[in-house]
Amino acid sequence: MVLILGRRLNREDLGVRDSPATKRKVFEMDPKSLTGHEFFDFSSGSSHAENILQIFNEFRDSRLFTDVIICVEGKEFPCHRAVLSACSSYFRAMFCNDHRESREMLVEINGILAEAMECFLQYVYTGKVKITTENVQYLFETSSLFQISVLRDACAKFLEEQLDPCNCLGIQRFADTHSLKTLFTKCKNFALQTFEDVSQHEEFLELDKDELIDYICSDELVIGKEEMVFEAVMRWVYRAVDLRRPLLHELLTHVRLPLLHPNYFVQTVEVDQLIQNSPECYQLLHEARRYHILGNEMMSPRTRPRRSTGYSEVIVVVGGCERVGGFNLPYTECYDPVTGEWKSLAKLPEFTKSEYAVCALRNDILVSGGRINSRDVWIYNSQLNIWIRVASLNKGRWRHKMAVLLGKVYVVGGYDGQNRLSSVECYDSFSNRWTEVAPLKEAVSSPAVTSCVGKLFVIGGGPDDNTCSDKVQSYDPETNSWLLRAAIPIAKRCITAVSLNNLIYVAGGLTKAIYCYDPVEDYWMHVQNTFSRQENCGMSVCNGKIYILGGRRENGEATDTILCYDPATSIITGVAAMPRPVSYHGCVTIHRYNEKCFKL
């Protein structure tokens, strides 16, 4: 059309005029002749915008059409208001509203570097900028000020790619200052994974106390052994010993001193002059010594292994009865609450028995007695994954309970087929002997038994076939005597107890209630309800929480549910299912070495 129009104009310029009919043919088209291609959408693509930007940048260099001068640190940058406003909402607000800068030719900007402004303008006028380790920080801050999110994100991405043990803590602090949550998380995870290397660098020694604690308290800290954490903390303290000495006790509460190798503990920790001159640390040292003697009997946040060491706390379920209670199960299986994995261990010997007692001694597991009147005692060696027969009970029994107190195993009460037993026996694993100690004040079967604050507690139980007891009987090994304490709020048998943080928790007995007992203050309180009534359930403390596994419901059938109760929040949740419904089983927590090291 343009060519035709051009030809027509040329003809007129030559003095040749077309007739009206010819003009109609030139400018009018017969609709019947249209084929659907009467228009053409043309686009030069992104190159058009790039060419325009390039021309604007040339204009800027030659000060052509510039209408504002940005002054930073005394250096002037001629610019175009339209270009700045199109790229940055900061400048759009400055130039488009009735601000003083919208009328002035010279605009001064403080708080940034001239180099940063040069890089920023290069990006604005070209869409490109070279981000380096030297300019990334001020370029990030400048793009944040001018609200250029694309450039800001590019700087954050660049920092993420530069993570190294020598700089990750500094980048993390930078990310925290600028609310870069993704970068902050990546920095923290990187530092957790490479803690051994990170702790050797200057940035680590410059952490503040809270930042250091945030790392050393983490279960996800990746280390080969706990000694690395202790040494890192001591390096940090000795860096500014006069200022940091008062923080030593607080820091060591987050180091898992009980998990240090006994030789290292004696030869390195106990002889450290700073620790020796800090009486407030003595209790932590005492806890570690006790753990080396008593093992898992003494549980605290510091006895829980970090998963990266290859060890984890697992719940071991021993035997039990299947759904309708008519078949005894031979299985010994461990459950890892963190991964949700179940693994089979060596099967329980002579599993034809039922209603035996189970407890953990150090990192091994004992099973005693069983129906009918068994005197057998087996110990599971967790390192060798085998069951070994040890010295038999003096008196056969079932429906009894076992607990460990100060390194000794106590078998309490039970039933011999005719009478409830008041008999209590104590096992010394070093001499492999059982000895009788003071009997219960009230003979019971199926009570809850646990140790706490240096004493043994026997709660509830059945004094005969038809009644339940609400008595709480407390045994003191120093005096070899029993005392009655505050009664449990509801008389029950077939209940289970665990101790955590110097408190005793009781569940089961075909009630929904979970009760908590404070042995120091001698009082009970109701803390939570389960989702259904059950008895003869398993109960164990793992990773600082209480797990209730299986049990028998009101209809007599076993259940496969697993509940998790967190005393810190008083929240109870259903977390998983067992491999099969089970009741009358044993549940204990031990440390188990995993085939693979769990890392982030």
Curated annotation (Swiss-Prot):
SUPFAM superfamilies: Kelch motif, POZ domain. It comes from the Eukaryota. The keyword Flavoprotein does not apply. It is found in: Perikaryon; Cell projection, Axon; Cytoplasm; Cell junction, Desmosome. GO terms for cellular component: adherens junction; axon; Cul3-RING ubiquitin ligase complex; cytoplasm; desmosome; perikaryon. GO terms for biological process: intermediate filament organization; proteasome-mediated ubiquitin-dependent protein catabolic process; protein autoubiquitination; protein ubiquitination. The keyword Coiled coil does not apply. Gene3D superfamilies: 1.25.40.420, Kelch-type beta propeller, Potassium Channel Kv1.1, Chain A. Residues 66-133 form the BTB domain. Pfam families: BACK, BTB, Kelch_1, Kelch_KLHDC2_KLHL20_DRC7. InterPro entries: BACK, BTB-kelch_protein, BTB/POZ_dom, BTB_POZ_KLHL24, Kelch-typ_b-propeller, Kelch_1, KLHL24_BACK, SKP1/BTB/POZ_sf. Changing residue 306 to H: In CMH29; loss-of-function variant unable to rescue heart defects and cardiac failure in zebrafish morphants. Its main location: other. Expressed in the skin. Found in keratinocytes, dermal fibroblasts, and melanocytes. Basal-layer keratinocytes have lower KLHL24 expression than suprabasal keratinocytes. Expressed in the brain, spinal cord, liver, testis, heart and at higher levels in the skeletal muscle. Transmembrane segments: none annotated. PROSITE patterns: BTB (PS50097). Keywords: Cardiomyopathy, Cell junction, Cell projection, Cytoplasm, Disease variant, Epidermolysis bullosa, Kelch repeat, Repeat, Ubl conjugation, Ubl conjugation pathway. Autoubiquitinated. Autoubiquitination leads to proteasomal degradation and is necessary to control KLHL24 levels. One of its GO terms (molecular function) is ubiquitin-like ligase-substrate adaptor activity. Residues 168-270 form the BACK domain. Forms homodimers. Interacts with GRIK2. Component of the BCR(KLHL24) E3 ubiquitin ligase complex, composed of CUL3, RBX1 and KLHL24. Interacts with CUL3. Interacts with KRT14. Necessary to maintain the balance between intermediate filament stability and degradation, a process that is essential for skin integrity. As part of the BCR(KLHL24) E3 ubiquitin ligase complex, mediates ubiquitination of KRT14 and controls its levels during keratinocytes differentiation. Specifically reduces kainate receptor-mediated currents in hippocampal neurons, most probably by modulating channel properties. Has a crucial role in cardiac development and function. It is linked to Epidermolysis bullosa simplex 6, generalized intermediate, with or without cardiomyopathy: A form of epidermolysis bullosa, a genodermatosis characterized by recurrent blistering, fragility of the skin and mucosal epithelia, and erosions caused by minor mechanical trauma. EBS6 is an autosomal dominant disorder presenting at birth with extensive skin defects on the extremities, leaving behind hypopigmentation and atrophy with a whirled pattern. Cutaneous fragility and generalized blistering persist during childhood and decrease in adulthood. Cardiomyopathy, familial hypertrophic, 29, with polyglucosan bodies: A form of hypertrophic cardiomyopathy, a heart disorder characterized by ventricular hypertrophy, which is usually asymmetric and often involves the interventricular septum. The symptoms include dyspnea, syncope, collapse, palpitations, and chest pain. They can be readily provoked by exercise. The disorder has inter- and intrafamilial variability ranging from benign to malignant forms with high risk of cardiac failure and sudden cardiac death. This is Kelch-like protein 24. It comes from Homo sapiens (Human).
